[in-house]
Amino acid sequence: MNVAVVSPEEVLFEGEATQVITRTTDGDVAFLAGHAPFVGTLVEAETRVYLTDGSVREFQLAGGFVEVSNDTVSILAT
């Protein structure tokens, strides 16, 4: 699936991943390929992006929004 993690200042990550784990106001959530459409508000927490090569990118986010649609996870970090 395609993943983009962006802040107002820069693109933090853009690429392919197998899984994304983040925390919303409703708790931790994991996204895999084919996930149903989703929109949520992020809280301060670590977001982990699992890349196709087996490595993991970690981002400490202060909050923001996450949207999942058409096999794409978009994270707008604050």
What do these predicted ranges mean?
Residues N2-T78:
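Compact, glycine-rich, soluble single-domain proteins
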